Every structure is written in structure tokens, then in C-alpha cells.
């Protein structure tokens, strides 16, 4: 039994199918006990009988194992190979693994046998899986080298097996560990026909997204901003332009051509001149004013014909010429040769009416055409500036001369047309028309991007040149930049700068050593000090020296003048001079090598792209051959003729982009270093390089391994990136959708302070200087400063006030609160102290945010009375905390009880409060006792004293009515304890109750206060109005902000009117003028 099994195994290993079949058929016990899925062990690389049967292509034994003994072709050996891997290995691959059967020397027969075996493996069905399907042979199984059966079949050149694998869904794009596809494996083994067949199937493979990508490719606008024109295209373009212009002006073709030639073939320019003065336009062009045709006719019906009989003389003919050719004679004389013109001779009709014989006409026209003046041939009559029509020239000269005339005419058309230029390549008869000059603001056109100053154009034969200088194409560089780059290459001689990078690194290291280290005084080794004293010891030569003066340390003792003798100025200066010279020399060397290294960086990449461009130019020749080969190979397999022009299109896109990348490095070299413009340019340049290299890898290969739709998508992406790159350079390296620059300050510019929420520095500086000079009257008499729209207000439309909405109301409310607080704490004895404090406060800089916050917090904590409208507005304003402090950005409203709501003011309004403090401290007349005693007690009580009901309804805490200035100075003392020493404390002196003072009551601290309160009926009326408005606000919450602002404006106006009505004539007569003026100024603020 064991002997039979051993013989059978040896027959399988040696590939002797006849012996193996004889042993297997003659031993029933072996047939029953043999399992084709059991490994032979490690000595045999864990191959199974099925592996050996597939390796040698034993179709009879393989069929028996698969369908009779439940063999599994997915079993793997030690190399992770299945039976299909070994089956697809040809004789060339298996030579090194053992002896081969003699029939394997015949590869054709072996190919068919292996194809039959492969067909059996592909038809095999295993156990039933969970999904209801049966196990199949893994057609894309990979071994340890990541090879699939298709890799081995392609490398072996087994065409039948390759076709079977591809038909059953073998992966054409699978890559092994060497990143080779089955096509690459066939190419390496010189199976060219098989490689070409695999390439065609790879390129034209079907993919779900292929149709969508090809549809986008077909719809892609492939137009360029230029158009190459052949000679026939030039003639057609000229004729179309003449016909369209003649039809538009209702003029003959000859007249339209003359008009266009006189206006540089620019139809828009001609129409502009025609609309201004048609007669002058025709006179300057050398033609007569055309007669408008009758209705129902066009310009073609008005063309003169040489066969029509001559009409009467034109009115432009001179009297002398009329006398020389009288109309009553049957024959006329030629004005050149003075011979009679035969009646049998075909007449030459001219619009001017001059007669010449046909011989003179031919001689004259031949001479003009030979001289090259084909586009400005005037009538040969004396002082006649009538152009000779084209039909006259064609009817007189010979055919050869007519052909030459047409060439000169086309040449004149191109040279006089600024939008058309000839190709500068020698022997090229083509021209280029720049079809897109400038950008389209609408942005609907895909070619609406702006053109560069020196765009590159192509005549259609692959001749690229610059539109401006007619030299080598160099976009995105302009002509001057390109010239500077070529001059830079000539000066630098980069072929001699081979070791610049190494020299630059050496110079940089030398500069670093000189800057951060000192040489040892003995062995000159660089030493860097990072800790310790000035006593240094060289780690190399053990030399002790001083770090300061670099001399021996034994010189630093008490006997030599002290340890720190070297710290004297003379010694240090001497050492620094020596090191400074070395550092300056190293810096110069480093800077020079740095510039050289920078040039070599750009020059190296410039040459790399140039070399790649030269290599990829060869693809233009091979692309057509590749297209024919792919088309022929696919036609043999599928019978169709596919579109292969995408290969040539992709090569053209690659070459255009490669040329732009080559010239982009000179452009970047001359950009300003470390600028935003250069950073954006380099980012876009890198992005363009990435997509370009990706397309080059797909196209620049002997055999294409990328599907058609992926090549098309890569080419479209490169074209899109190229257009975006050029458009950005033409715009100055800025994205197309860049937003407007924010309102910020640049070098030499100014901030828009109101936009940022601050008062302008000019506004603050002017008020600070006035307060420091003590010019309080100029502050009081200059109310326009508060209303300047250019500095402290927003720009509002016409018809609205110049200041910000609600600013006047807030200022008025703040002033009234401030003045009432000052009136409570006022006393004659403390007036001078308060004035001194205010003058000291004015010496501080209100630009300091601490001052502004102090005033705001004082308003928040003072607990002063304010009406409901002002309370609602102040509670909704933005706090100064939003400008950088720790306060909240918006103050929450607080119920009106023992604590007043917080008032949030802007910086400009806080400055107005400071101005009011100065006015209150500097003006002493309104608070004189004579002024207060001159008014009756009843009037003063009605104007200044609140009723008991008002005080109870207010619910104020007596402790909240502190001095405003005291709160400011106390808070500022906590923030700046040193600066507050300059400010004298405010003295609080009690005053005795006198009968002439109005409504004096005792406070909680013994200080007598007085308040300005409106009459009771007005208070109750206003309270009712505010309650009704609050109820309406709750019903309409969306309109609360708008209504509040409108009511605040009306309340400000009504308060001014109430003040005006409160000044009765009798009171004004009894009060001095200074008091009334002061009160009016207080209320106006």
C-alpha cells in the first residue's frame, strides 16, 4: 500500500500522467483512500495531489479529483498558491522547480491542455454557502508575491488561458508587489501581441462612471483664447467680415473693405466713426459715400459690374478732366498714353469716372502688385484718391498676378489687424488670431478669465510662440521677466555652480559657530557655553581659559589684577572687535551662498520640467501609433472601432502644462520673498504639479494601464487647474472669488474707528487738549463736535440725522443723570475741591480703558433715576466688556427695585460724560447763592424737589446715591494706586439750612441733597404712557427694538420742548442771564 502511494506521488511530481492514471486505476484501495486535498507535508511545500495535477496540466486526473473526489482548487500551499496559480505557470516559470515532462517542450499543445484544465476549474462548484450560492474557484486569489493567476498566464504567454480568465472576470488592473499588472508581465516576457490585447481591454474597460465622465469630456469647452488660421481660413475670415460690415452699413463690398482697412479691420471702431460722421469716415477711407439702396434691396444689389454700361461722370471729376474728355465725342483718349480707346475694348469702369486704356491699366496694376502695395492702389489720375476696386484688378491682370495680389491682400489684412499675427516659424504660412482679449464680468463664459500680458499661442501646427515678442513661449512670465531670467542664467553660469548647496551649508554652519560659540584659545575648537562661570576648560585639549577675554585662566587672580579684570570696557571692546570682523565676513559669505542656493533651487526645477517636456514631446509621435494599435487590437476582439483621440488630447494637455510649469519658476524667482502673493502662488504651483505628474504617469508608458475614463478625467483636471493657475497669475495671484478686504489698518492707512466700535483718536485728542487748556467755554460753545458724522457717527442715508440712532437720547439721559448726581453732592465749600479733582482727572488719558470702565461701572452702581425708555435702551446696548474686559458682552435687564439697571455706553459717549464733568466743575456762576436765592421757593421746589409719592414709588436705596466722582476715583485707585496720588480727595462739607435754598433734606450720612424732579401731573402722565407702551411691546415682540428707538427720539424732542415751556417769562426776568444760559446748556446736553 505504501509503495503504491509513493509511486503515485512520484508520478504526480514528475508530471507522468499515463503512469499516474495506470496506478490510480489499478489500485481500488488507493482510489478509495486518496484525498486530493491533503498536503504532502513540508518537504513538498505543502502541495496537495490537486496542486501537482494542475501544475503539470493532467486534465484526466484533475477532472477525477475535482468531480469524483471532492477536490477543492482553493487549497493553498506554503507559498499561498492555489491550484489555479500552478496551472497558469508556464514551462519557463517551472524550469527551476524540477524536471519537466517531454510534452511541455511543445508550448502550443501545452497551452490548449492547460486551457481545458482551467475550464474545468472554473466550472467547479463546492459546498453550498449561507447565501444560497456555491463555492467557486477564486479567480483573483493572490499568493505571497501578490500575483494572481492572470499574472502567471500573461507572463507565460498562454493566450487561451488569459482569454478565459478575462472572460470570467479576471482583474486586469491587479498589481503584484512590483506594481506590475498582467499587461506589464506580458511585456517583460516579450509577449507583445498578448500585452497589446490586454492593454486594449484595460483602456476600453467598462465602468459604471465611465459614461458620465465621457459625457463631461464631450461637453468640456476645449477652446483656447487663440485660434490657428490657415491661408484659406484667413480669406474666409476676411470675406465674412467684409460681407457682414457691408450688410450692416448697406454699402458695396468694396466700400466696406476700404472702410475696414482704414480702421485696422476693427468693426467696432468703424461703427463708432460711422455713427459720428459717415461722410468724413468715407472721405478719410478714400471711398465715396454709398447711396442707400431702395427698400427691399440689400447691399449685393448695389454692387457695380464691369459689364454694365458706363454712366455719367461723377461729380468728383475736376473741370479740367471734363474738358479733356468731352462727352460729345464717340471715342475718348487715355489720360496716360493719350491714345484713343477702342470701342471694341472692354471698358474699365471706375467710380471716379477716369478713363484709361486697358494696356495702361494692366501695366499700372502689375507695377503696384510687384511693389507690394496691394491694399492701397489709388486711381492713376492726378490728385485722385479713389481706391481701385478689387473687381477691376481681377478683370485686368493675369491669373498669376491675381493670385499674387490675393497673397499681398491677405498679408496686408493680417499686418493691419492687431488681433491677428503671423506665425514666426520659418516656412509656416499660418496665422494666429487672439479671440479673447480681457475678461467677461458676467463670468458665464468658461474662457472669461483675464489674459496674461504675454500669452502663448499656437498656430495649429505645434508652433508655440509668445504673442507679444514672437519668441519662445514663456507664460506665465511676461517678456521682461523672461528676459531678466535669461540674463540671470548668463550671469550666474549654473553649470559651474555644482557644489553650491554644500557650500551654502558650510557657510551657514560657520556663521552659526561664530554667532553661538567661541574658539578655544589653544586648539581653536569651537566651544559653546550653556551653563557655569567664565572659567572654561576645553574638552579636547584640557586648556583652561577665560570665556570673556579668551586668555589663560592663571592670569585671572588677585596677583594679576583681580579675577574680573577682563570685564573692563577696554578688554571687552578688543575681543568684540575681533569677533565682529569674523562675524561680518561670515555673514557676507553666508548671504552670497544663500542667494546662489536660492537661484539653484529655481534653476534646477526649471531644468527638470524642461527635460520632462523634451521627453514627453516624443509621445506626440508615438500617440498616433498607439491609437492605431489599440483600435486594431480592439477591433479584432470586439469588432468595434473605438475613439482613440483621447490619448493625443491628453498628451497635448500634458505638454502645455509642463511648459507652463517650466516657466513658472522664473516667475516665482522674481516675486517678493516671504509675501502673501508668493505663498499663494507656490500653493497653486504645487497643486498644478501634482495633477500634472499624475497624468504623466498614466500617459508616459510603453503600454497604457489606465482605463480610458480615468485618463480623460486626469486630463480634464489638469486643463482646469492650468486655466485657474493662469487666470490667478493674470489677476495678480488672487482667487477669483476673493472677498473685499476688511476695514483694517495697513501701513500708512487709518482705522475706521466707528466701524470697530471706538471713538477716533482725533476726537479724543481734541477734547483732551481743550480740557487741559481749561477752555471749558469752547467745549460748551462747540456742539458740532458731538455730531460729526465722519468720526463719531455711522454713515446714514439722506434724510436721517447725522448721528447714530439713539445716541442723542442716550447722551441726553446720561447728562441729566450726571448733572442730577452732581447737584445732590454740591456745596459751596466743596465746589473748589470738586473742581480740583476734575482738573486732576482731566490730566489723565481717557484712552485708557480703565478710565472708560470706571465711568461705566459708576453709572451702573450709582442707582440714579432714569425714565423707562432710557432704561430699556441702555439695557439693550452692548457693553464695553465686549472690547476685551471681563464684563459680559451684553447687560441683562434688572427689575426696577433697590438696584438700578446697568447702563452700557460706547467709548465716544463716555468721553461726552467726561466733557460734562469738566463743564460742571469749571462753571461757578450757576451755583452762586445769589442766583439760587433770586428765584422764589415755590418755583425752585417745583423744579428741583420731588414729592413724597415719587420718592416712594422710585424705591431708591439712600446708600446708592453716592458721589459719582468718588466712585470713579475709588475704582481707579484699585486699578492704578500709583496714578491716583496725583488727584486730591474731594472734601465733603456740610452746609447749614438756609431759607433761600430750595427743598433741602437730610440724607443718611448727613449730606443734604437736592433733586431735579418734574411736576407730579407730568410724572403720572408719563408713567401711564410708558405702561401702555410696555403692554404694546409685549404684544408685538418683533417690533420692540424699532418702537423703542422711535419713542426715544420722540421723548428727546419732547423733553427739550418741555424745558422750553418750563422757562416762564417771570422766572426768566427774576433769574440772572448766566443761570438761564447754564440751565439751557445742561438740558441741551
UniProtKB/Swiss-Prot annotation:
Segments forming a coiled coil: 576-641
Binding positions for Zn(2+) 5 per the UniProt entry: 546, 549, 556, 566
Renumbered zinc finger spans (IBR-type): 402-479
InterPro entries the UniProt entry points to: Ankyrin_rpt (IPR002110), Ankyrin_rpt-contain_sf (IPR036770), Ariadne (IPR045840), E3_UB_ligase_RBR (IPR031127), IBR_dom (IPR002867), Rcat_RBR_ANKIB1 (IPR047564), RING-HC_RBR_ANKIB1 (IPR047563), TRIAD_supradom (IPR044066)
Key words, A-Z: ANK repeat, Coiled coil, Lipoprotein, Metal-binding, Myristate, Phosphoprotein, Repeat, Transferase, Ubl conjugation pathway, Zinc, Zinc-finger
Pfam family, one: Ank_2
Positions of the UniProt region annotated as Disordered: 282-322, 764-808, 884-907, 921-959, 1014-1085
GO molecular function, one term: zinc ion binding
Annotated residues for binding of Zn(2+) 3: 466, 469, 474, 479
All residue ranges annotated as the UIM domain in the record: 846-865
Superkingdom as given in the UniProt entry: Eukaryota
EC numbers for this chain: 2.3.2.31
SMART domains the UniProt entry points to: ANK, IBR, RING
ANK repeat locations: 45-75, 145-174
UniProt zinc finger (RING-type) residues: 334-384, 520-549
Binding sites annotated in the UniProt record for Zn(2+) 1: 334, 337, 357, 360
Class in the EC hierarchy, top level: transferase
SUPFAM superfamilies per the UniProt record, alphabetical: Ankyrin repeat, RING/U-box
Biased composition (Polar residues): 926-959, 1068-1085
Listed PROSITE patterns: ANK_REP_REGION, ANK_REPEAT, TRIAD, UIM, ZF_RING_2
Reported function: Might act as an E3 ubiquitin-protein ligase, or as part of E3 complex, which accepts ubiquitin from specific E2 ubiquitin-conjugating enzymes and then transfers it to substrates.
Domain remark in the UniProt entry: Members of the RBR family are atypical E3 ligases. They interact with the E2 conjugating enzyme UBE2L3 and function like HECT-type E3 enzymes: they bind E2s via the first RING domain, but require an obligate trans-thiolation step during the ubiquitin transfer, requiring a conserved cysteine residue in the second RING domain.
Protein name stated in the entry: Ankyrin repeat and IBR domain-containing protein 1
Amino acid at each position: 500500500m505504501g509503495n503504491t502511494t509513493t509511486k503515485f506521488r512520484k508520478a504526480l511530481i514528475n508530471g507522468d500522467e499515463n503512469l499516474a492514471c495506470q496506478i490510480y486505476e489499478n489500485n481500488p484501495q488507493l482510489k478509495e483512500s486518496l484525498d486530493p486535498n491533503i498536503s504532502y507535508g513540508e518537504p513538498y511545500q505543502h502541495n496537495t495531489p490537486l496542486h501537482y495535477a494542475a501544475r503539470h496540466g493532467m486534465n484526466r486526473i484533475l477532472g477525477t479529483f475535482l468531480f469524483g473526489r471532492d477536490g477543492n482548487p482553493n487549497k493553498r500551499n506554503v507559498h499561498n498558491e492555489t491550484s489555479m496559480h500552478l496551472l497558469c505557470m508556464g514551462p519557463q516559470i517551472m524550469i527551476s522547480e524540477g524536471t519537466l515532462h517531454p510534452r511541455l517542450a511543445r508550448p502550443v499543445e501545452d497551452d490548449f491542455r492547460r486551457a481545458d484544465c482551467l475550464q474545468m476549474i472554473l466550472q467547479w462548484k463546492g459546498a453550498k454557502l449561507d447565501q444560497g450560492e456555491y463555492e467557486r474557484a477564486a479567480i483573483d486569489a493572490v499568493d505571497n508575491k501578490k500575483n494572481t493567476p492572470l499574472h502567471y498566464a500573461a507572463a507565460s504567454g498562454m493566450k487561451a488561458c488569459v482569454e478565459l480568465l478575462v472572460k470570467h472576470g479576471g482583474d486586469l488592473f491587479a498589481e503584484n508587489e512590483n506594481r506590475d499588472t498582467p499587461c506589464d508581465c506580458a511585456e517583460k516576457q516579450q509577449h507583445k501581441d498578448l500585452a497589446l490585447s490586454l492593454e486594449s481591454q484595460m483602456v476600453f474597460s467598462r465602468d459604471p462612471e465611465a459614461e458620465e465622465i465621457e459625457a463631461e469630456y464631450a461637453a468640456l469647452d476645449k477652446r483656447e483664447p487663440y485660434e490657428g488660421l490657415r491661408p484659406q481660413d484667413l480669406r474666409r475670415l476676411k470675406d465674412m467680415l467684409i460681407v457682414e460690415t457691408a450688410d450692416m452699413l448697406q454699402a458695396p463690398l468694396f466700400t466696406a473693405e476700404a472702410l475696414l482697412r482704414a480702421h485696422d479691420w476693427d468693426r467696432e471702431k468703424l461703427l463708432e466713426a460711422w455713427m459720428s460722421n459717415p461722410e468724413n469716415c468715407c472721405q478719410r477711407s478714400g471711398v465715396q459715400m454709398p447711396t442707400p439702396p431702395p427698400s427691399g434691396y440689400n447691399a449685393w444689389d448695389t454692387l457695380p459690374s464691369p459689364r454694365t454700361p458706363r454712366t455719367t461722370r461723377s461729380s468728383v471729376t475736376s473741370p479740367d478732366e471734363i474738358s479733356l474728355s468731352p462727352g460729345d465725342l464717340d471715342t475718348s483718349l487715355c489720360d496716360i498714353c493719350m491714345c484713343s480707346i477702342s470701342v471694341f475694348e472692354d471698358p474699365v469702369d471706375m467710380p471716379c469716372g477716369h478713363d484709361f486704356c486697358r494696356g495702361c491699366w494692366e501695366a499700372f496694376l502689375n507695377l503696384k502688385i510687384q511693389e507690394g502695395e496691394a491694399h492701397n492702389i489709388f486711381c492713376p489720375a492726378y490728385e485722385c484718391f479713389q481706391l481701385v476696386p478689387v473687381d477691376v484688378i481681377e478683370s485686368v491682370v493675369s491669373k498669376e498676378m491675381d493670385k499674387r495680389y490675393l497673397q499681398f491682400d491677405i498679408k496686408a489684412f493680417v499686418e493691419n489687424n492687431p488681433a491677428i499675427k503671423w506665425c514666426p516659424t520659418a516656412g509656416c504660412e499660418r496665422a494666429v488670431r487672439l479671440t479673447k482679449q480681457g475678461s467677461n464680468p458676467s463670468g458665464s463664459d468658461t474662457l472669461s478669465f483675464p489674459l496674461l500680458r504675454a500669452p502663448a499661442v499656437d498656430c495649429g501646427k505645434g508652433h508655440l510662440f509668445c504673442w507679444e515678442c514672437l519668441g519662445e513661449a514663456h507664460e506665465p512670465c511676461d517678456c521682461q521677466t523672461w528676459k531678466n531670467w535669461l540674463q540671470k542664467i548668463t550671469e550666474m553660469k549654473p553649470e559651474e555652480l555644482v557644489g553650491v548647496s554644500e557650500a551654502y551649508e558650510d557657510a551657514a554652519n560657520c556663521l552659526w559657530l561664530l554667532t553661538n560659540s567661541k574658539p578655544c584659545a589653544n586648539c581653536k575648537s569651537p566651544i559653546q557655553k550653556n551653563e557655569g562661570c567664565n572659567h572654561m576648560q576645553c574638552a579636547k585639549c584640557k586648556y583652561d581659559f577665560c570665556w570673556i577675554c579668551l586668555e589663560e585662566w592663571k592670569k585671572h587672580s588677585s596677583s594679576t589684577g583681580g579675577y574680573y579684570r577682563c570685564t573692563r570696557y577696554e578688554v571687552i571692546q578688543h575681543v568684540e572687535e575681533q569677533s565682529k570682523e569674523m562675524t561680518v565676513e561670515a555673514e557676507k559669505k553666508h548671504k552670497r551662498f544663500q542667494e546662489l542656493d536660492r537661484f539653484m533651487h529655481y534653476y534646477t526645477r526649471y531644468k527638470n520640467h524642461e527635460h520632462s517636456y523634451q521627453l514627453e514631446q516624443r509621445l506626440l509621435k508615438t500617440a498616433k501609433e498607439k491609437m492605431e494599435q489599440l483600435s486594431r487590437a480592439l477591433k479584432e476582439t470586439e469588432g468595434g472601432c473605438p475613439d482613440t483621440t483621447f490619448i493625443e488630447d491628453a498628451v497635448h494637455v500634458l505638454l502645455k502644462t509642463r511648459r507652463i510649469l517650466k516657466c513658472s519658476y522664473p516667475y516665482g524667482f522674481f516675486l517678493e520673498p516671504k509675501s502673501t502673493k508668493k505663498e499663494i502662488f507656490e500653493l497653486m504651483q504645487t497643486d498644478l504639479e501634482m495633477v500634472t505628474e499624475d497624468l504623466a504617469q498614466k500617459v508616459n508608458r510603453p503600454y497604457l494601464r489606465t482605463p480610458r475614463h480615468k485618463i480623460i478625467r486626469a486630463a480634464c483636471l489638469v486643463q482646469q487647474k492650468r486655466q485657474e493657475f493662469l487666470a490667478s497669475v493674470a489677476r495678480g495671484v488672487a482667487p477669483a472669488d476673493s472677498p473685499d478686504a476688511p476695514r483694517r489698518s495697513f501701513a500708512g492707512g487709518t482705522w475706521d474707528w466707528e466701524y470697530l466700535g471706538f471713538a477716533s483718536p482725533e476726537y479724543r485728542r481734541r477734547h483732551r487738549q481743550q480740557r487741559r487748556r481749561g477752555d471749558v467755554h469752547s467745549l460748551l460753545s462747540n456742539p458740532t463736535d458731538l455730531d460729526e458724522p465722519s468720526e463719531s457717527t455711522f454713515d446714514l442715508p439722506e434724510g436721517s440725522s447725522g448721528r447714530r440712532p439713539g445716541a442723542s437720547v442716550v447722551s441726553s439721559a446720561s447728562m441729566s443723570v450726571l448733572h442730577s448726581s452732581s447737584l445732590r453732592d454740591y456745596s459751596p465749600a466743596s465746589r473748589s475741591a470738586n473742581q480740583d479733582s476734575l482738573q486732576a482727572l482731566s490730566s489723565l488719558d481717557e484712552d485708557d480703558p480703565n478710565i472708560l470702565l470706571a465711568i461705566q461701572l459708576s453709572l451702573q452702581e450709582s442707582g440714579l433715576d432714569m425714565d423707562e425708555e432710557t432704561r430699556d435702551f441702555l439695557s439693550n446696548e452692548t457693553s464695553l466688556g465686549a472690547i476685551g474686559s471681563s464684563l459680559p458682552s451684553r447687560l441683562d435687564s434688572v427689575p426696577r427695585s433697590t438696584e438700578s439697571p446697568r447702563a452700557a455706553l460706547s467709548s465716544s459717549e463716555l468721553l461726552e460724560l467726561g466733557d460734562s464733568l469738566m463743564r460742571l466743575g469749571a462753571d461757578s456762576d450757576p451755583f452762586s447763592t445769589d442766583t439760587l436765592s433770586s428765584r422764589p421757593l415755590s418755583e425752585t421746589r417745583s423744579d428741583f424737589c420731588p414729592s413724597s409719592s415719587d420718592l416712594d414709588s422710585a424705591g431708591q436705596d439712600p446708600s446708592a446715591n453716592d458721589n459719582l466722582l468718588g466712585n470713579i476715583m475709588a475704582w481707579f485707585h484699585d486699578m492704578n494706586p500709583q496714578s491716583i496720588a496725583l488727584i486730591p480727595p474731594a472734601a465733603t462739607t456740610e452746609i447749614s439750612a438756609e431759607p433761600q435754598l430750595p427743598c433741602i433734606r437730610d440724607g443718611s450720612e448727613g449730606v443734604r441733597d437736592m433733586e431735579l424732579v418734574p411736576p407730579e401731573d407730568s410724572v403720572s402722565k408719563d408713567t401711564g404712557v410708558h405702561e401702555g407702551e410696555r403692554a404694546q411691546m409685549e404684544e408685538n415682540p418683533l417690533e420692540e427694538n424699532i418702537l423703542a428707538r422711535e419713542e426715544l427720539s420722540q421723548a428727546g424732542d419732547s423733553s427739550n420742548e418741555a424745558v422750553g415751556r418750563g422757562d416762564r417769562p417771570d422766572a426768566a426776568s427774576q433769574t440772572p442771564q448766566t443761570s438761564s444760559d447754564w440751565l439751557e446748556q445742561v438740558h441741551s446736553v
